[in-house]
Amino acid sequence: MFTQKSFEIFSIDGLEARMAEIRSEIQPVFSEIGQKLLTELSAKISNQEFYFHIAQHRRRTANAPENTWSAISTKARGYKMEAHFQLGIWEDYVFIYLSMIDQPKKQKEYAELLTNLSVEKMLTEDFIISKDHTKAEVFPLSAFSEAAERLGKVKKSELEIGRLWPKERFDGKEDSKILAEMLETIDQLLPIYQKLMEV
């Protein structure tokens, strides 16, 4: 599980130095939790194969990443081309999202579906949304409808929906509770995900 050291990594200066710590400290946690999320997904959607990915930030040449993430998708060679699940970390929180980022192939179809779904009624109010995977800012679930409409109208718009866990909770005392909440987050998002995969 993540620890306070996981969050301190984002204070390290320099691309190589920060990436070295991300690889040694954060990516093994992604793999550990990711396998549990993968098992949960595979049990709930048994007729679909899922693949686990870890962001490598290979295109970066100068700036160290301000966050990092892993993803679960139905594609072996990538994840951004479709709606997918993400487990990631910023300097002050960990998140799990159902993500539509970087102009997925069915962006307009996703937007149309989500605009007509009563998503706010399908999820508990502690769920939040992100409109840009490169920024730490999040918005309440009440902002979902507007963001879903924007996904259909603005080519470069993004939409992620899920939960976050503030860094203060990662003191080693709540690890099993946090993991249970993560699995439950996937379960709550599954009905939405399954509808997205049908479009």
Curated annotation (Swiss-Prot):
Similarity annotation: Belongs to the UPF0637 family.
Organism (species): Lactococcus lactis subsp. cremoris (strain MG1363)
Parts forming coiled coils: none
Origin: domain of life: Bacteria
Protein name (database record): UPF0637 protein llmg_1936
Pfam hit, one: DUF1054
Lineage: Bacteria, Bacillati, Bacillota, Bacilli, Lactobacillales
SUPFAM superfamilies listed in its UniProt record: YktB/PF0168-like
